[in-house]
Every structure is written in C-alpha cells, then in structure tokens.
C-alpha cells in the first residue's frame, strides 16, 4: 500500500540529504517527493509517497524521528486531507487534432500554457487520479513529455471525508 507522509523539518542545509540517505540505507523507495516552506519561515514541509505495509511505515517514522532536524512525522494516508499535484504534459497536436486536444484539456479543467505548430502543452492540477485519467485520454495523440511535481497534502481541519467530497465533485 502507498502511504503519504507529511514531515516537518528545520529548514537547514543537508536535511533532505539525510532523509534520502535514511531511505536508501534501509532500501525503501520514495515514489513522490515535494518540499517547500511551511507556515513558519524556518520550517519546511516534506510530503512523500512511500510504498509499504503498516510495520514498515511505523519503522520509517521511528527512524525519521531519530534525525536531528525532524520536528514532526505524520502518516496522513487515512486522514481526511486535501491532495494536489501539478503536471505539465506536452502532446502532439497538429492542426487537424489540436481542437480535440484543447477540448479534452477543458473537460479536465486544465490550462493550455503553450501551443506550437506541432504540440500543445497542458497544465493539470488535481489529485493523482486526475493525472492518470488525463494521461490515458491524451495517449492517443502522442505524449511527447511529462513533468510532474510530487503530491502535496494538508490535513482537513473540518474532518470532512475526502471520499465523500470526491463523490460530490464528480457530480458537478
């Protein structure tokens, strides 16, 4: 199972290297990684997606807490949260199929950020499922390049069930 970990760390040089080193030494893979400033200026939030069972994640959490600059580690996989990812996709789109590519982007509420004679570059923001869905739909046109950020996530203060919100979102 994939787990989403939210890690608060002191914003100092080498922290990410130590965390990556810990994962490498233990033979764990990081499938997605996003790092940025948190609410306090001297703290960064690392959001990572890691495959593993409950025991593996518990062990990783304990190991992360042993690192000097780690403030808080939270497995937010089962916690109601807001998740987003950003993706840029460059798609083959000559004159005959360009309108169809643009229309497909609009269906996914994506933005066209660049158009050339032979390609369209699309910016997609949403949950990881949306990324997979639009890539599947664009595949028939020929995907030239893809660049994705890692997943970012914040716990919902309202405690509203994420699955319930997704079901509402799909109705509109």
UniProtKB/Swiss-Prot annotation:
Which pathway does the protein contribute to?
A: Amino-acid biosynthesis; L-isoleucine biosynthesis; L-isoleucine from 2-oxobutanoate: step 1/4; Amino-acid biosynthesis; L-valine biosynthesis; L-valine from pyruvate: step 1/4
What catalytic reaction does the record list?
Answer: 2 pyruvate + H(+) = (2S)-2-acetolactate + CO2
Gene Ontology BP annotations: isoleucine biosynthetic process; L-valine biosynthetic process
Q: Would the keyword Nucleotide-binding turn up in this protein's UniProt record?
A: no
User: Domain of life here?
Assistant: Bacteria
Record Pfam families:
ACT_AHAS_ss, ALS_ss_C
A single GO molecular-function term is: acetolactate synthase regulator activity
Ranges where the ACT domain occurs: 4-78
Annotated EC: 2.2.1.6
GO CC annotations? cytosol
> What is the enzyme's main class?
transferase
Keywords, sorted A to Z: Amino-acid biosynthesis, Branched-chain amino acid biosynthesis, Transferase
PROSITE patterns reported in the protein's UniProt record: ACT
Q: What protein family does this chain belong to? A: Belongs to the acetolactate synthase small subunit family.
Complex formation? Dimer of large and small chains.
Q: What is this protein called?
A: Acetolactate synthase small subunit
Q: Which organism is it from?
A: Synechocystis sp. (strain ATCC 27184 / PCC 6803 / Kazusa)
Name of encoding gene: ilvH
